[in-house]
Amino acid sequence: MDRPKPFSVQQLADTLCIPLVDILLPCRFCQRFLTYIELVSLNRKGLQLIWTEEDFVFACCSSCAFATAQFEFSNFYEQSVCSWEIEIVEQKPVGDIIIRCKFCLKKLDLIEKLDICYKEEQFHKVRRNWKGLCRHCRAIE
């Protein structure tokens, strides 16, 4: 029976019994190797590794994640809702809704979601997924 493939960079490092700093992962889109900071960021953002049928593993670098987010927002935008309205649309609490940053694709934590609701900002539905603004991208916007 095949061993399950790791979904995160940390799981990959643990599976291979090597330190995270020694992981060399190419970006699926630009083929550049991710830096150590990008590897750590990939874990923090909750992004998964990309596996091919031939068992090659790839990731997505920060530049390509940003470009992908912009492309999807421009081409697959569906709707926007104001703060708490997302709970009405989804029929569940905002804490239970998966929302990613519209710029860096980080999975938003509860504080970031509540901050958007408190400030009465908008959530955007893009390609059947909700987007908001993470604290890091908010600080540099």
Curated annotation (Swiss-Prot):
The keyword Transcription regulation applies. It is found in: Host cytoplasm; Host nucleus. Its main location: host cell. One of its GO terms (molecular function) is zinc ion binding. GO terms for biological process: DNA-templated transcription; regulation of DNA-templated transcription; symbiont-mediated perturbation of host apoptosis; symbiont-mediated perturbation of host ubiquitin-like protein modification; symbiont-mediated suppression of host innate immune response; symbiont-mediated suppression of host type I interferon-mediated signaling pathway. Signal peptide: none annotated. One of its GO terms (cellular component) is host cell nucleus. SUPFAM superfamilies: E6 C-terminal domain-like. Keywords: Activator, DNA-binding, Early protein, Host cytoplasm, Host nucleus, Host-virus interaction, Inhibition of host innate immune response by virus, Metal-binding, Modulation of host cell apoptosis by virus, Transcription, Transcription regulation, Viral immunoevasion, Zinc, Zinc-finger. A zinc finger (unnamed) spans 27-64, 101-137. Plays a major role in the induction and maintenance of cellular transformation. E6 associates with host UBE3A/E6-AP ubiquitin-protein ligase and modulates its activity. Protects host keratinocytes from apoptosis by mediating the degradation of host BAK1. May also inhibit host immune response. Belongs to the papillomaviridae E6 protein family. Forms homodimers. Interacts with ubiquitin-protein ligase UBE3A/E6-AP; this interaction stimulates UBE3A ubiquitin activity. Interacts with host BAK1. This is Protein E6. It comes from Human papillomavirus 15. The lineage of its organism: Viruses, Monodnaviria, Shotokuvirae, Cossaviricota, Papovaviricetes.
